[in-house]
Amino acid sequence: MPSKRRNNGRNKKNKGHADTVRCTNCGRVVSKDKAIKRFQQRNMVDASSKRDIQENYAYAQSDFTMPKIYVKLSYCVSCAIHARIVRVRSVEDRRHRYTTKLRQHVRPEAQTGNASLPLALLPKI
């Protein structure tokens, strides 16, 4: 029977057994290499509360930075599809690997894929 994906939906190569993690959404036990992992960083308080805290802070505002919450989320495949963290892709598109964020030091012409065009002729994003 033909394989649906090159990696069979897992990141495990020649390891034998992979550890398990719990899905953040439903609690299902899923292998660590198969789980869809996302790293989330957010402010501890919302924007309006943050503004109030900074205005009423006793010390210099330049010395104070609000702490952030850093959470590593891991989802099972069904929850990741349901929450639209990953989407169902066609057979050709499954072969393409991509990252969710572009790096900051990439030039604008490289982001659009028109590296041969000069910067002035590029469409405005």
Swiss-Prot record:
One of its GO terms (biological process) is translation. Keywords: Ribonucleoprotein, Ribosomal protein. One of its GO terms (cellular component) is cytosolic small ribosomal subunit. The keyword Ribosomal protein applies. It comes from the Eukaryota. The keyword Ribonucleoprotein applies. InterPro entries: Ribosomal_eS26 (IPR000892), Ribosomal_eS26_CS (IPR047864), Ribosomal_eS26_sf (IPR038551). GO terms for molecular function: mRNA binding; structural constituent of ribosome. Belongs to the eukaryotic ribosomal protein eS26 family. This is Small ribosomal subunit protein eS26. It comes from Sterkiella nova (Ciliate). The lineage of its organism: Eukaryota, Sar, Alveolata, Ciliophora, Intramacronucleata.
